Amino acid sequence: MNVEVVDFQAPDAPESFTRSLRTTGFAVIVNHPLPHELVQQIYDEWLAFFDSDAKYAYRYSDGDQDGWFGPDVSETAKGNTVKDLKEFFHVYPWGQYPAEVSDAALRYSRTATEIAVTLLGWVHDHTPDEVRDRLSMPLPQMMDHSTRTLLRVLRYPPLRGDEPDGAVRAAAHEDINLLTVLPAANEPGLQVRDLAGAWHDVPCDFGSIAINAGDMLQLATGGYFPSTTHRVMNPTGESARRSRLSLPLFLHPADDVVLAEGRTASSFLAERIAELRSQDRKTA
């Protein structure tokens, strides 16, 4: 599977990135403006937070979907029957934020969003005219006045050996949004599925960022950019006794953006959240 590693500063970066996203749904970028030290700081601070009782004061708001989601309410991937082995905190600029950590995650969210919007501009500029003609507006313009972009601080706890049969850290799924920005986690495990159904490890070199297309981009472009299936597998050996932390930023358009005829970003998001809740009820 030819997931390209793209130098963010290279003259041909926009074309190379868009080509990889088109053919695989994924790309890996290096030499980008996101400080490695900032990512490590967030991993250290939030691991301590997840290990503390402080998290219980920030339980998620059902309406706004901000705050801490414990393992008891963790997601069940669409089409799956077992909950993922994870807990996470949804960070929005307007939402709950723990007093027990610094503002590092907020600073990361702003920088990652800027990178994602730049990448979205690259995609728009290097998309064929016949695909761009499908769009209700230029891709970067979809982000104007958006309040939906989400940073998920994810913690996959150490495995204890008593996990339910078939449970994995993150079952095979696709993302809902336009683009996802995912810096290398502190442990490997992320895999992506190619068109033939084979699974491939995504590079975990610290300092690299994996980018994948989501369902909204696939819908808006009529399938030109595929929303690629990915998963996080359970580790073995010593790695199984360590937490895995991850910082996906999900780039979402403004609510009123029309993705396809009769489907706005808001209605599509509501539809997908309803599907996830339905799956969760089946596994409760």
Indicate where each model-derived feature is located.
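Peripheral, non-catalytic segments flanking oxidoreductase cores
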Residues: 1-284
